[in-house]
Amino acid sequence: MEAEKVKCLIIGSGPAGYTAAIYAARANLSPVLYEGLQPGGQLTTTTDIENFPGYPEGISGTQMMDDLRRQAERFGTDLRYGVATAADLSRSPYKITIDAVSYTPLRAHET
């Protein structure tokens, strides 16, 4: 089966993953984000976050991750569930396998 070609593939749905998705979506890169085993990442197990900019009164980890997810969706991120099982970064184009489906990045002339 031929690999699905994507402009931007993000693996993981913690704060970094969702932030990358928001920026990529705003840059019209049509990001595909795989949420993994625990959507929202480890931060969903944190009860109070008091040291993150923009939340002067603090926020729960679950609420913060819900906010980030909604914002990523709002800008057009394609959110999917799956687990990365292999990554071949030894040559270009890279090949990432998620639950038996392979992905490769689009090259600039293919976009």
Report each predicted region and the residues it spans.
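Aromatic pocket-lining residues of Rossmann-like dinucleotide-binding sites
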Residues: 24
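N-terminal Rossmann-like dinucleotide/flavin-binding domain of flavoprotein oxidoreductases
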Residues: 44-103
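Conserved small/polar residues in nucleotide/adenosyl-binding loops
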Residues: 104-111
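N-terminal Rossmann-fold NAD(P) dinucleotide-binding loop
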Residues: 17
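Glycine-rich FAD pyrophosphate-binding loop
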Residues: 27-42
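Beta1/beta-strand and adjacent pyrophosphate-binding region of the FAD-binding site
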Residues: 3-13
